[in-house]
Amino acid sequence: MKELSSSLRRIILLTLVVGIFTMPVGAASVAVSPPRLTFTPGPGGYFEGEIEVYGAKDKDIRVKTYFLDWDFDPSGNVQFYSERGRVQRSATAWLQLEPKEFLLPAKVKKHIKVWGRVPAGTEPGDYWSMFFVEFIPFSGLQTSGVKISGRVGGSVTITVPGMIVPTGRISSFTITYKTEEENPELGGKIIFENTGNGILEPTGRLEIKDLQNKLIGTVPIPPAKILPGAKREIELRHTLTLEQGKYIAIALLDYGGEKLAGYQRIFEVK
């Protein structure tokens, strides 16, 4: 343990929220910084920060700002929700942006204030939202050229200090081995559950042993970001040549807890 400070419309993006991402904004360059905001206020505490929007090289742009709730589906794809109430640990209701809409002249940098207050009585743990800076097509001062549109987003994480306990487990593990192809492939799927109140990013390995417990090979397990209370399917695909026989596959994940999470399977290569 450690102390640390229905929407009917949803958009699914095939990306991990580890920083900033963009939807096309046209030929001219537009930038938003920083890619993520983190705050650690206590229950009832006020927090404040800012993001900077850098204007296009030669175009005036109309801009609006807002927050959206998000989470991951079991495969790790990001899901955004246009209506609130779908995400249990959402921080969106606590957050404010100012200004909400403005005209950004070419080559000008604009500061956007982000602030809020954690409701009194909020339990310790991680809460989150996503800010968006959307560029609206604007032609009031243009007679030709590219019209810029699209949006840039970044993550907001609020950690309410207290007893934040990283707990989790591997609830399922399957293993396969294909020999029909030119390159024999070891495959499988791990389902990891985050049973704690903080965001986990487990890393680990898959150990392949023979029945005499001799280590034959090691396969890295892809990293994943798993929200509190969520399950994540982690796919395994790795080229590995094995002789015929039975083997033991041991999945080991370090998620920051006192012990590694583990799961064992026996499989056969024919």
Question: What are the residue ranges of the model-derived segments?
Answer:
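Short proline/glycine- and polar residue-rich coil/turn motifs
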Residues: P41, F102-K110, P223-R232, K259, ...
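A short tyrosine-centered beta-strand micro-motif
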Residues: Y127, F131, G245-L253
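Bacterial N-terminal signal peptides that target proteins for export
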Residues: K2-I12
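Short, solvent-exposed loop/turn segments enriched in Ser/Thr/Gly
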Residues: S33, P43-E50, K110-I112, E123-M130, ...
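Short, surface-exposed loop/turn segments at beta-strand-coil junctions that are enriched for proline
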Residues: R117-E123, R237-E243
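Beta-sheet-dominated interaction scaffolds and their linkers
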Residues: A27-I61, P99-F102, G168-E185, K189
